[in-house]
Amino acid sequence: MVTLTSSSSTPNVSFDFMMNNNNNSNNLYGPFSSSSTSFSYLTSKEDALTQKNLMSGITNDVLGINKKASEDLEISVFGAEKYFNGDMDSDHSPRLVSPLPDPEVPIERIFVGPKQSSKNSSETPSLRSESSWNSQSLLLQSKYVEKKKNIKKNSSCNSYFQEKDMSSNHKVSNKKSFLATLGCRCVCSNWSSVDVVDDKRRSSGLKKIKTQLSFSGDLSSEMKIHQQQQEAMLEQRKSLEIFGSPLIEKRIIQKKFPWEYSSSAKKEEHGFSVKYEEEEDGSVSDVSTDLFEIESLTGKANPFLARQGSSDPDSPDGYAPSEVSIQWSVVTASVADFSVMSECATSPVKKNRSFQIPRIPIMAKSNREIAPQRRKSSSSGLLMGCKSHKSVRVSGDSYTSMNRTPSYVPRFPVEANPTSTETRRRISSSSVSHTQSPFLYT
């Protein structure tokens, strides 16, 4: 005989099926076929239902068992439907309902709290658990302080622990390292130790600054040595092509002062005598007379030359008049046919004659040599004085041409030899002209 019961959602109905094997015929009897047997089964089912109703209040609090019982009942319902539909040919025995929970089971093992462990151990805590709990409490306290002050520090113990939110009561994962179980005190476990690490970092920063300063001092010394080496190399590389030689510089300076160079250089290099210097002065005056001759032929004196001679009386540009210049002035005056006497009378040159004839300190001769020359020029009278003034005025322009050619080049080969007969003849002829000059204008 098989008993099937429905779930709590359906009405409680029991069906009894009896099979008569004595008659060798499969006769299926419906419920209440026999009064004696059916009554006995009904009473037993009623007792079971009453017990189930009593336990329904308890099973509402027990979530896991109630869910499991409902699943078993649903499965049994599906099995009954298959049985009535005739689909359970292979399996003639339907699935039985799981037995109801025993009311004598203690409540402690049935009720499971949501935040409690699945089992309550009544054993005493061991040394290992106490050490792990102490280390865990220290670590949680240090982490709480760090989060409160918003300080994030990296340490070697961060790899062994997993931080959780503050709302979860600072729980840590079940995976603990070997060092945590032994209760080690790491760098992050104490606040004072963290300060010590910070101090060490600051000291290391100061050391870095010191090393940089020392390196900069060494660098400055190396730069000084390198600069000294470059200066030494530049001194060795000095040559005539780049910086010039002192001899060339000396010659350039001497070219700026040709009167100094003409006297000193010729004495040192050639060794001419004093007579040659007198002849050189005469040749310079000859060059000036050529220019004066051109001026006299035009019949008009150049005012620029006159201003040039009178504007700077103290300049060493002029030369003392010589006999040859006086001779050429007399000849040109007679050819131009103009009165030199009238010009001398109108011009105030005679009064300022001392200022019109400047002296050169280096080229000038000694007082003993100049004195007879002055006497000769003054002995000829007023006419000679005017002609000397003409020669002096031209000498300023002649000196500008001498600046262009500082070295004296004689025009004729006879002038190179001051002791020749030609120069003596010219000197004698000039002396004769001095004696005859007053009679030209009678």
From Swiss-Prot:
Provide the free-text tissue specificity comment from this protein's UniProt record. Expressed in leaves, with the strongest expression on edges of the laminas. Not found in roots.
Phosphoserine: residues carrying this PTM: S239, S245
GO terms under biological process: leaf development; phototropism; red, far-red light phototransduction
Record field: compositional bias (Polar residues)? 397-406
Swiss-Prot/TrEMBL induction comment: Up-regulated by white light.
Its record classes its membrane topology as: Peripheral membrane protein
Question: Mainly localized where?
Answer: membrane
Segments carrying the region annotation (Disordered) are 110-130, 394-442
Q: Which GO terms describe its cellular component?
A: plasma membrane
Q: What happens when the gene is disrupted?
A: Increased hypocotyl growth inhibition and cotyledon unfolding responses in the very low fluence response (VLFR) mode. Reduced phototropic response. Reduced hyponasty when grown under blue light. No effect on negative root phototropism. Auxin accumulation in protoplasts.
Give the keywords, sorted: Cell membrane, Membrane, Phosphoprotein, Phytochrome signaling pathway
* Cellular compartment(s): Cell membrane
Bias type Low complexity, positions: 121-130, 428-442
Family that this chain belongs to: Belongs to the PKS family.
Further information: PKS1, PKS2 and/or PKS4 are essential for phototropism but not for inhibition of gravitropism under long-term blue light irradiation.
Subunit: Interacts with PKS1, RPT3, PHOT1 and PHOT2.
Instruction: State the function annotated in the UniProt record.
Output: Acts predominantly in the phot1 pathway. Involved in the leaf positioning and also in the phot2 pathway controlling the leaf flattening. Component of the network that modulates the very low-fluence response (VLFR) branch of phyA signaling. Regulates phytochrome-mediated photomorphogenesis and hypocotyl phototropism. May act by controlling auxin homeostasis.
Q: What is this protein called?
A: Protein PHYTOCHROME KINASE SUBSTRATE 2
Origin species:
Arabidopsis thaliana (Mouse-ear cress)
